């Protein structure tokens, strides 16, 4: 049956990267060859970082960091260090492994078929089931999440991301016992160094017991980021922030359903298994070769190496 609001949806949603609807804010026609050359040379000079020569990937990182070369370098450093030191999120990234398969069975992650007028892409996630699983499921959830956005960064150029997290099917025990300050701190640190600008986060269908988690979350992020976090009891409220063409049909938008977007992402993650196991998405920093910061005597609590790991400002 055709939805009543289909007449208001004037963009046909397609999931191919080349078909994404973009605007003048899009950077697709800009090669940024000089900046990419500088990044390749810089990576070659960094003893602890992998020697990346994938120009399209580096270009997407540069665009994601607002065309700032030094910001991109800082981001790449943190990006690869996180992957080396936070094993629960970035250990063996096998799409057919038990941990990732469990996450795929329980959760959908999808990427909007269209971009906003500003060139932002919407990431939507929803749990399929609230079943209990052995171990720390949120670590598996986070591993799968970063595999999905790594895959998307490899294929698509965007100016930033907006996240919609549908909490309609949430495991109360997981949320209240596994979302610890340490888990949030590591998650936020990883997101800080990811080569995407975080525009907004929308939590919808939020259960009342989740308030304690959001209080912890907000206490760990700068006020600037707090202003980008929204909680909605009514899912349709996201339509006040994001245009319909970028919102799944089951949330009142014109894009494909969360299930369709999630299944597409899942299929692609499995299809790119070699890239996750042995290709660019498996690469990490060699922390034994990381230069020490001679200007600092501080010890990083997160990364565990001498010297103060420079923290990015999220903007």
List PLM regions with ranges.
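Basic, amphipathic alpha-helical/coil surface patches used to engage anionic, phosphate-bearing ligands
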Residues: 1-315
């Amino acid at each position: 049956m055709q939805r009543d609001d289909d007449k208001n949806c004037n963009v046909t949603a397609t999931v191919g990267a080349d078909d994404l609807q973009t605007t003048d804010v899009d950077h697709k026609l800009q090669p940024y060859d000089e900046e990419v050359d500088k990044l390749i040379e810089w990576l070659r000079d960094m003893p602890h970082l992998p020697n990346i020569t994938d120009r399209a990937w580096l270009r997407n990182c540069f665009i994601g960091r607002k065309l700032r070369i030094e910001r991109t370098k800082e981001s790449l450093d943190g990006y690869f260090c996180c992957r080396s030191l936070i094993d629960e999120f970035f250990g063996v990234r096998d799409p057919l492994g038990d941990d990732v398969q469990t996450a795929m069975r329980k959760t959908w992650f999808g990427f909007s078929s269209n971009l906003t007028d500003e060139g932002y892409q919407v990431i939507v996630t929803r749990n399929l089931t609230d079943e209990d699983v052995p171990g720390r499921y949120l670590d598996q959830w986070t591993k799968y999440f970063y595999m999905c956005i790594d895959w998307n960064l490899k294929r698509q150029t965007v100016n930033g991301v907006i996240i919609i997290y549908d909490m309609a099917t949430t495991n109360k025990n997981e949320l209240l016992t596994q979302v610890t300050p340490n888990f949030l701190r590591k998650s936020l640190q990883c997101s800080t160094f990811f080569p995407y600008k975080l525009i907004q986060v929308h939590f919808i269908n939020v259960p009342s017991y989740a308030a304690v988690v959001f209080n912890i979350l907000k206490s760990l992020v700068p006020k600037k980021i707090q202003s980008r976090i929204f909680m909605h009891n009514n899912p349709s409220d996201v339509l006040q922030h994001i245009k319909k063409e970028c919102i799944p049909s089951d949330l009142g938008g014109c894009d494909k359903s969360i299930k369709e977007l999630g299944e597409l992402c899942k299929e692609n993650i499995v299809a790119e298994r070699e890239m996750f196991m042995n290709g660019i998405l498996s690469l990490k920093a060699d922390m034994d070769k990381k230069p020490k910061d001679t200007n600092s005597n501080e010890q990083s609590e997160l990364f565990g190496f001498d010297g103060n790991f420079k923290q990015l400002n999220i903007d």
